[in-house]
Amino acid sequence: MAKQNKIGIFTYMLNNYGAVLQSFALQHYLQTNGAADVEIVNFETIRHQQLNKIFRKYSDNFLVQLCFIMLTLLRYKQLKQRKIKTLLFKRKYMKFTRVYTSQTDLFSNLPEKDVYVSGSDQVFNPNGLNRDVYYL
């Protein structure tokens, strides 16, 4: 890989260990194999923000939502610690572009890169969010 390459990574980033470590590993691999600048494209819509909340709407069904809230309360401390740890890790070890909050925002202000990479198992989830962004 030529040293002048600027690479943008499109990935489905949630505050869980798997998503963060997968993104970090890809970014680190590209950096240590010759890329001059590697950034994760920080695409975070309102729906992404909702999914990253500890308490969120899980279902329209009242009983299902109530069960979700109760289970979340039982695991609140663990979920809060995980969220803090992943945010601190991302700040310390990972490089991101500015935040893009919509497809329109992203497509009209696409970060200038030589190469774009799409990664993460969730990028190819047929039920995933904003698939057009990740399918390059």
Language-model segments: what does each one mean?
Residues M1-K6:
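Extreme N-terminus of proteins, especially the signal/transit-peptide cleavage junction
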Residues I7-Y17, L21-Q22, L26-L136:
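Aromatic- and Gly/Pro-rich donor/ligand-binding loops
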